[in-house]
């Protein structure tokens, strides 16, 4: 699927946010008992658009399977793949902005190619992006994104 402009209209109850969700943030949002379950629930409801790449999907599957179960991983991946509010990109160019953990660059590259508004992460390796002028990539902490989702729901 090709990246879409932020002006795309989804449903009237969407934030029209295009985000990249770091694996550990996704993992924290999957359990119904989690404080951050709303992040997963709002994705399923189509309230924001998730930007992914094949390498991100592979990491999601591996980490969810190892921390939860292979079945949970399969359900999460199938849910993502069937959702209409997903942008799947193939980043042909790698920016190599994160040197402390080069594996994290797949999230940055996806965000740039998909024109995502920000990456939701708790990983301190992404802090380098705050001082990188090009390409501009914003980061938000999971609690900030959660609060944004809650604020959006308020009448």
Whereabouts are the PLM-identified features?
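Acidic, PIN/NYN-like endoribonuclease modules and their adjacent C-terminal/linker elements
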Residues: 2, 6, 124-155
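Alpha-helix capping/helix-boundary segments
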Residues: 25-26, 56, 125-126
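Metal-dependent nucleic-acid phosphoesterase active-site entry motif
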Residues: 2-33
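PIN/NYN-family metal-dependent endoribonuclease catalytic core
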Residues: 21, 35-65
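Hydrophobic/aromatic ligand-binding patch that stacks against planar heteroaromatic rings
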Residues: 42, 110, 131
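Active-site neighborhoods of divalent-metal-dependent phosphate/nucleic-acid chemistry enzymes
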Residues: 85-119, 124, 128
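A secondary-structure boundary/capping signal
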Residues: 22-23, 52-53, 122, 141
């Amino acid at each position: 699927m090709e990246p879409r402009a932020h002006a795309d209209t989804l449903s009237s109850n969407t934030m029209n946010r295009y985000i990249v969700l770091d694996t550990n943030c996704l993992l924290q949002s999957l359990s119904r008992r989690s404080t951050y379950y709303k992040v997963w629930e709002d994705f399923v409801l189509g309230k924001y658009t998730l930007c992914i790449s094949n390498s991100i999907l592979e990491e999601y599957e591996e980490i969810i399977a190892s921390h939860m179960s292979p079945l949970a991983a399969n359900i999460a991946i199938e849910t993502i793949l069937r959702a209409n509010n997903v942008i799947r990109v193939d980043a042909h160019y790698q920016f190599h902005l994160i040197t402390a953990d080069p594996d994290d660059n797949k999230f940055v590259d996806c965000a740039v190619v998909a024109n995502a508004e920000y990456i939701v992460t708790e990983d301190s390796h992404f802090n380098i992006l705050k001082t990188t002028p090009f390409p501009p990539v914003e980061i938000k902490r999971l609690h900030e994104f959660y609060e944004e989702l809650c604020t959006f729901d308020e009448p």
